[in-house]
Amino acid sequence: EEHKIESAYVDDASKIIGKISDIPKVVVDIGGGAAKGFPSQLLEKVGCDVVTINSKLEKSSRGPDPTVDTLEELVTNTKNRDIGFAFDLDGDRLVIVINGEKKDPDVTLGMGVVKALELGYKNFVLSQDTSISVEKYIKQNGGTVFRSKVGEANVTEKMIETKSQVGGEGSSGGFILSDFNYCRDGILTSGLIASIIKKDEFADALNFMEKYHIIRDKVEYDSEHHDDILKALHSKMKEKFGSVETLDGIKAIVDEDSWVLVRKSNTENSIRVSAESNSLEKVRNIHQEIKDLVKESYEQIK
């Protein structure tokens, strides 16, 4: 059953974004979700030429989570447009498609950050598994970065604690601007990104962020073993890397462009292994080495 919602959302969001003068051509992929209507309305209001796909409720050519779907219809429809935006069903996750190529969700956060820096924001909170490229970009442009545990609530908590105006979670393509609201907001973010896609900073930042490769994966183990596995793994990783961070799971900084993070899932019987480097070969090797160490740790404690 559908209900019409009366809301000042589009007007309020458009005030933050401002009017876009160069009329970007955008494609909006609603994914058949409840967020339908709002993204297209907002993007049109700020000055975009908008084409919308998958806008019928509960009817979609793709799955509900744009971070894991191939987004084939959006990719096809974006080839002659400036950018494509794919939302999850409630509009907090956002993935972008440029030149017919789906980008990592960290790039969504990164592009929100580019706009936030342009707006004069200085303090940023990033979850522990967010790309190092976003952190480096912020620091290179005079901003300060704080890291939080993974999860939207942890990011917003750290934002309040550190008086940071902007936050985000790379893994979910989630960008948070506290002057608007304290949650991931893909709809607002799409407008913020649309306002800079024809600027040099957009191309420069995209080029910089795409030099990095991130692998996020999980290995299945019963949750009753998770703590013991991580305890055994902690000493192995410390021995291998010299030092580790334990803000959320176990994170090792391999070098200034590479890291690996192992943490237990809060929602399923799995241990998550994320790794990043500016070398694809290196990130694959690091990721596999640590997955092997997780397995060794399990063999040791079972």
Q: Where in this protein do the model-derived segments appear?
A:
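Short, glycine/acidic-enriched loop or turn micro-motifs at the edges of active sites
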Residues: 32, 89-93, 172, 279
